Amino acid sequence: MADSKNVLTATDGNFEADVLKSPQLAIIDFWAEWCGPCRMLAPTVAEVADEFAGKVKVYKMNVDENPGTPSRFHVRGIPTILFFKNGAAVDQLVGNHPKATLVSTIQKHL
């Protein structure tokens, strides 16, 4: 996965405290090591995390290591990006999307 100090790791254990209780817009990229489209999306997620640092919290969650949260939010395919604001899922993108789509979706919720 593409590395960025602005991409945080979400787990079933920290999801509630870190993502749902975030005072900022939080986006979470559900992915898996074996997922080709997830690997293609990773650099885009890292770029967006860097561009919106301080305004948006960006997380990645490995669905194989953390099955509870994806099930709770009905994530059926990966990659899936969910957008959370004030503790609620407000938007989602399924599949590999261009950077412009992620940026416009983020801007819609800021």
Please state what every model-predicted region is.
Residues 1-27, 32-57, 65-80, 85-110:
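Proteins that catalyze or organize thiol-disulfide redox chemistry
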Residues 60:
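Conserved residues in the N-terminal Rossmann fold of short-chain dehydrogenase/reductase
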